[in-house]
């Protein structure tokens, strides 16, 4: 608990700015329509759900920028796929 | 050693021209031979920020069209004799110069100068393409605002696509009191998002407007914090081991209390 937030009246609009930017840039960076990520999402969903039950609402796909060990930056496609349970049949 | 650096931002009004003028002036103060090139054809302003607007005879378009020699168009600074300005044309548009002509121009300038600083127009069209042609490195200027950071990110992508790798970031007009209140993105927030190396941070400072009113780059005035920040930026440009200037000079009761609790 940040004592100064409670008493100092911090409004933290910068967190809102940062969050909005991060979301905005996901789309800007791939330089395509927001539909692009939706299409990837759907295809990932179709393939993975043959093997596991996944939480469709929790599925997140985004493009991020990461620093590599040699200090250059690369774009990466990150998919966060929450698993409900493994499908018995396949295992 | 000879290097052409383009100063760009995407969004207009974030301080490209002021940054170009100050980096160039301080490099010249340090004894380097510097050429400032204004590529904002139709909306030139570097001449005004440098206070050299009354000395323009020829411009960049005259040079590339062969109307005059390069040396005739270069205006020598009032204060430093190793500092020159090649002004943009005011009555033409961005298509008056091609990227090939720019590359040739930069090559020619490299014969005379140590550093060529190219002030890029806002936007991502022809003017931007001209400005980055022939550049060896890029400096991206942004302010701690959503729109400016977004455009900076777009520019970084375009620079990468044009094979201008590892651009350096300048965060302009930061207000430390707003950062402390949590109402302005901090240096770390912006670096986090843009993921490029930080060159320098310039505080929001009224003195910049005062110096621009007079046509004198602020680095000439040692006292102001913005001037020190620009000097620090240039020192870091020349040697990346130079630590970043500390702009957080607040020493009120709350500042000390926060430090005590390691919150600031």
Curated annotation (Swiss-Prot), chain A:
InterPro entries: MinE, MinE_sf. GO terms for biological process: cell division; regulation of division septum assembly. Keywords: Cell cycle, Cell division. It comes from the Bacteria. It holds the Pfam family MinE. Prevents the cell division inhibition by proteins MinC and MinD at internal division sites while permitting inhibition at polar sites. This ensures cell division at the proper site by restricting the formation of a division septum at the midpoint of the long axis of the cell. Belongs to the MinE family. This is Cell division topological specificity factor. It comes from Caldanaerobacter subterraneus subsp. tengcongensis (strain DSM 15242 / JCM 11007 / NBRC 100824 / MB4).
